[in-house]
């Protein structure tokens, strides 16, 4: 590049400005959803509801008043360790079978799973308390799994945290011997468990 003729890049360098921009408001987790919404001009304190509502919008799920939307990742836990946040980037087709199975076994009038893309899905709960401490799996690869379970931030959120943790643990039992995961493991791939 040193000897290339780059008149347009040269002009950009001559007229351009550099600097830093704070894209994450104080008190917000520095995730991509927060930064992207801030860059797009959203007033985070008044509109941010978490990743779940964005996931719902991206797959066309219309949320009703009183529903709580949560991002639902298919992850890989090996032993007691969160091996990876994406189940080895599971295909959407494989994931759809697993999400349908979870819906059949764990879904109800108050709990519904929706298929998204690859490992990224949606869980909608009627009611519930959003004041929860949820650790994004991509932030903690190779960490012990159990300490990462959902914790209530206030006593009123205990019931919601307990429900979500129960869904997580039951899903592990359901998915461990699912044909999709057995096939993935036979092929040397990580299971979505």
Residue spans of the language-model regions?
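Active-site nucleophile/metal-coordination loop of metallo-enzymes that catalyze phosphate/sulfate
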Residues: 1-106
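Glycine-rich, mobile lid/loop segments that gate access to catalytic sites or pores
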Residues: 86-192
